[in-house]
Amino acid sequence: MSDKILCDYCIKEITQNNYLAHVQKFHEENFLEIMKHIIQMNNDGYTTDEIAKKFNINESSVFKKLKDLSKNSNDIKEPLRISKWEPHDFKLEATTVWSFPDRGDWATHNGTYRGNWSPYIPRNIILRYSNEDDLVLDQFVGSGTTLVETKLLKRKGIGVDINPKAIEIAKNNVRFKKNNEYDPLIICGDARKLDFIDNNEVDLVCTHPPYANIIKYSDGIKGDLSLLDIDEFLEEIKNVAKEAIRVLKKGKYCVILIGDTRRHKHIIPLGFRVMDMFLEAGFVLKETIIKEQHNCKSTGFWYKRSIENNFLLIAHEYLFVFRKQ
């Protein structure tokens, strides 16, 4: 049951659920002033819960009003509805097999961006291989999962992606007010050409490259590695690895997630081929982690196909932890 509060303008007792509607109906000028402040706080990165507490009104009312307004105005950003800032009962992984059936729903994390990795992965990597105030680079930032974690964990973050749409999504996902002093730098650019980063400047590289010709992230953007065939992809990954080792400090770590693919019923060991590219660039391999996949189609159509055509469904990826000597 919604709590009752006194209207600031007519002293009438109103439920929190109906407060905004009441002010809009009976105190229009005051309503417009309240909405002006609510919109400003929303655009500044405050969550709907923080806004609701500020004005002592119902959170659902704030969310609904901002959601409706943002649909009709480019000047009003999507409301941030965040129920928690960290995972429940989190513990660092301690073995070389990682499994996260729960995708993770803290902060702005969600699984709507195709191919993004579980936030448990960068959280583990960042906590294990960096310290507060360190500089963390994601060369394929996508929807910004890594940078949400750098901001939450008080690291300085840099994210790069060649797709302007991804950049827009990433910027929206990190715009929350919490730890604002750790707002990351997000740049539309090429993972193979990080000219704006000096040699030996980065403390940790933490990234999830696209897979060759699996999920296409654009309709033909020049330099989009997801559009390449396997041989072309591997050739360009060499340049990604060279840039990673150039910008990384000595003794620091570069961690990438990559998986295999299948062509004509046979496995192509893309993961190990990518690993070789990073070793050739000068890295040494510290850890090989098997990351179990939970979004593979193990029932229905694909299960039937795997039996009929005698192949196994790929249900793992590789998390390679490299070190710069």
PLM features: what roles do these ranges have?
Residues S2-E13, N17-Q325:
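Class I S-adenosyl-L-methionine-dependent methyltransferase catalytic core
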